[in-house]
Amino acid sequence: MMNTIRRLLQEHGRLHMPVAQLSDLDDLYGAGLTPFAAIRTMLALEEAFDIEFPVSMLRRQSFASINAVRDCVTQLLTSAERRAA
């Protein structure tokens, strides 16, 4: 999952540095992530993981760090699994 998140951030995040240079806790907005790039990344994540970000997750905090993105994706995947069961 983390490799996919990092790849999508590299492709869509328009960061000022390579994602490989960022720790999982680094501030993505400090690294150059804009609101527009966050939305582009969110759409790519939705497609890659077959999830949909609810309005409640459309917050700056959801994309504050790689770990924050991972937490959102994990929560959405867990919710989808519960609905499928």
Regions from the PLM with identified roles:
Residues 1-43, 47-85:
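Phosphopantetheine-dependent thiolation modules in NRPS/PKS and related acyl-activating systems
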